[in-house]
From Swiss-Prot:
Official protein name in the record: Putative 2-aminoethylphosphonate transport system permease protein PhnV
UniProt keywords, alphabetically: Cell inner membrane, Cell membrane, Membrane, Transmembrane, Transmembrane helix, Transport
GO annotation (BP), single: transmembrane transport
Lineage: Bacteria, Pseudomonadati, Pseudomonadota, Gammaproteobacteria, Enterobacterales
Family: Belongs to the binding-protein-dependent transport system permease family.
Bilayer-spanning residue ranges: 13-33, 69-89, 104-124, 131-151, 185-205, 233-253
Keyword Transmembrane helix assigned: yes
Membrane topology of this protein: Multi-pass membrane protein
One matching Pfam family: BPD_transp_1
Length: 265
């Protein structure tokens, strides 16, 4: 095959590098330069300043950061709890039954987030479960959107745990609850932490559904960035974008490091 030849590997490396630079590095570099610019009327900024980052860490922008972290952690932890429960429950069924029941969790990931937001807005704007104008409606939307990815990660980890380990514990007289607490969950913990990292990053960057349903006082960072750029305040929006990217990456790196450490035990 071409990819196994030295020229093929070199060509693949060049293509991958070009795609990375064009579609990831350059846009991020432009956003960073914009966040530091005093004025940008030509090819390059005419001056640099940190005032946009100062604005991003004060007032409404700071509140948006706290709101994003609160919503992200709450929705991700609840999605993790439900994902673990669902993965453990589905393991009792056959392969075909697992496949069809898993689609219940995977379905929201196939629906545009705007459609999810609209559906939740209509469903919970009246009646006994009215949540419109509250934090709960945002948490519900984020949970629906990230639950599929959490369930997928946990299911993958659970599939890699040998059934023989639990069978040995059972043969030694361990109860189902003891096996779950002292055997299954400790072995599953690295995938649970990885699932938490993925769902948290997805929640932190969610815009489509949130912009339709967020209540006053719970503006998230993506919504704040959208509002700033929509008003033409590109530099402050760029600074807030860099803050969002940096915090999300730091959280993911920390959680993945924890997951790796747990996997080595």
């Amino acid at each position: 095959m071409l990819i196994w030849s030295p020229k093929g590997r070199a060509a693949a490396g060049v293509v991958a590098s070009v795609l990375f630079i064009v579609f990831f590095f350059l846009p991020l570099a432009v956003i960073l330069m914009s966040s530091l610019s005093q004025q940008w009327n030509g090819i390059l900024p005419s001056g640099f300043t940190l005032n946009h980052f100062v604005n991003a860490l004060h007032g409404a922008a700071w509140d948006a950061l706290l709101a994003s972290l609160t919503i992200g952690f709450c929705a991700s932890l609840f999605a993790l709890l439900c994902g673990v429960w669902a993965a453990l429950a589905l393991r009792q069924y056959g392969v075909k039954t697992q496949k069809w029941l898993s689609m219940v969790f995977y379905l929201p990931s196939a629906i545009p987030s705007v459609s999810v937001g609209l559906g939740i807005l209509v469903a919970f704007s009246q009646g006994p479960l009215q949540m419109n104008g509250t934090l709960w409606i945002v948490l519900t939307a984020h949970f629906v959107l990230i639950s599929a990815f959490t369930f997928s990660n946990v299911s993958t980890g659970l599939a890699r745990i040998s059934a023989d380990i639990e069978n040995v514990a059972s043969s030694l007289g361990a109860s189902p609850w003891y096996r779950l607490r002292h055997v299954t969950l400790p072995l599953l913990m690295p995938w649970m932490v990885s699932a938490l990292a993925l769902s948290l990053s997805l929640s932190m960057g969610e815009l489509g559904a949130t912009v339709m349903i967020y209540p006053p006082g719970w503006t998230t960072l993506p919504v704040a960035i959208f509002s700033l750029t929509d008003r033409g305040n590109i530099a402050d929006g760029a600074a807030l974008t860099i803050v969002l990217v940096a915090i999300t990456l730091l959280l993911m790196m920390k959680l993945e490091r924890i997951a790796k450490r747990l996997g080595q035990k």
